Design a protein with these regions (language model features):
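Short acidic, glycine/serine/threonine-rich loops at helix termini
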Residues: 16-18, 41-44, 146-154, 219, ...
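Residues that scaffold, gate, or flank divalent-cation-dependent active/transport sites
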Residues: 1-102, 106, 124, 229
Length: 294
C-alpha cells in the first residue's frame, strides 16, 4: 500500500525563534518582513489575538501594547538552517522524501505495516521535537491531497497528538465533511467561489459531485484533485525536480486595487511566499549566491 505522510512544522518561523528562547513557548509571537514592514508569521497564540498574515506592523501596535506580543525581525539564515535539520531527520525515517517547502515535506512510508503508520509518525514527531525543538503536525493518507486534508485536521488538534490518519473510506468521508471546499489543496479563491455558487461548500460536496461535471468545469487539474479525494494516486512524489529557471507567485484580483496600501500588502505577501519557495529549492543544493536574506 502506498502511504503518504505530510509533515508540516507548526508556525515555523515563530517556532524557530523559541528554540533559543524557550520561555516564549506558548506566548504570542509575530515575525516581520525584512524591513519590519508586515507580519509574515504568527504563533497560534498570536493568531488567536486576531493578528492577520500580511498586515502592516503599524496596524497591530495597539494589540502589542494591550497584550504581551513578542516581535521578531525575520532571520532567514536561522530558518534555513533549522529547516535543513528537520528535513535531514525526516530523510532518515522514511523511504522517499519530497521537500515541498521550507516547512513542509511529503514522506513515503511503504515499508512499514499499516498498523504502525500512526505510531511511526508519532515517533518522528517526538524526535524532531526533542532533537531540534520544532513542533510538527502529521497527516497520513493514501495520496498527497488526502494527506493535506489529514494534516489540516491534525493542526486543529492542538491538545492531542496532532497526528491524523485517513486511510479507509469511512475516515475519508468523515474528514471531508468537516473541511471547507476552499481548504482543499489546489482549490484557490476563484475556484472556491465558483464551487460555492454551484452549492459545493465542503470537500465532501465536491467528493459527491458527478465526475463529468468536475471534468467539464474544473478541467484536468480539478479532476486530478477530485480523483485524489476518492483515494486514487494522481500526483506523484517528486524527490528531485528539474532545476527551475524561474519562480512565480501570482493571484488574480477580484476587483481593481486603487489603494497603494492594499497593493503594498499584496506584494509583500507574494514576495515572501516566492522567497520561501526559492529557499526550499536550495535546501539540498549549493546555492549561489549564498546570501538569501532578501
Amino acid at each position: 500500500m502506498n502511504i503518504v505522510a505530510l509533515v508540516d512544522c507548526n508556525s515555523f518561523y515563530a517556532s524557530c525563534e523559541t528554540i533559543f528562547k524557550p520561555d516564549l513557548s506558548k506566548k504570542p509571537i509575530v515575525v516581520l518582513s525584512n524591513n519590519d514592514g508586515c507580519v509574515i508569521a504568527r504563533s497560534s497564540e498570536a493568531k488567536k489575538l486576531g493578528i492577520k498574515m500580511g498586515v502592516p506592523f503599524f496596524e497591530i501596535k495597539q494589540i502589542i501594547k494591550k497584550y504581551p506580543v513578542h516581535v521578531f525581525s525575520s532571520n532567514y539564515s536561522l530558518y534555513g538552517n533549522i529547516s535543513s535539520r528537520v528535513m535531514g531527520v525526516l530523510k532518515e525515517h522514511c523511504d522517499r522524501l519530497e521537500v515541498y517547502s521550507i516547512d513542509e515535506a511529503f514522506l513515503i512510508l511503504n515499508k512499514y505495516s499499516e498498523r504502525s503508520f500512526v505510531s511511526r509518525a508519532e515517533g518522528i514527531k517526538k524526535i524532531i521535537r526533542k532533537w531540534i525543538g520544532i513542533p510538527v503536525s502529521i497527516g497520513i493518507a493514501n495520496n498527497k491531497t488526502l494527506s493535506k486534508v489529514a494534516n489540516h485536521l491534525a493542526k486543529k488538534d492542538e491538545l492531542g497528538s496532532q497526528v491524523v490518519e485517513i486511510i479507509n473510506q469511512k475516515q475519508i468521508e468523515i474528514s471531508l465533511k468537516v473541511l471547507g471546499v476552499g481548504d482543499i489543496w489546489g482549490i484557490g479563491a476563484r475556484i472556491e467561489k465558483f464551487l460555492q455558487k454551484n452549492s459545493i461548500y465542503t470537500a465532501y460536496d465536491l467528493y459527491k459531485t458527478d465526475p463529468r461535471w468536475v471534468r467539464q468545469h474544473l478541467g484536468v487539474v480539478g479532476e486530478r484533485t477530485y480523483r485524489e479525494l476518492h483515494g486514487e494516486i494522481c500526483i506523484p512524489i517528486v524527490e528531485r525536480s528539474e532545476p527551475k529557471k524561474q519562480c512565480r507567485v501570482s493571484r488574480s484580483f477580484e476587483s481593481y486595487v486603487t489603494s497603494f496600501h492594499d497593493l503594498e500588502k499584496r506584494i509583500i505577501s507574494y514576495a515572501t511566499r516566492a522567497s520561501e519557495k526559492i529557499r526550499s529549492c536550495l535546501l539540498y543544493t549549493s546555492p549561489s549566491p549564498r546570501d538569501l536574506s532578501t
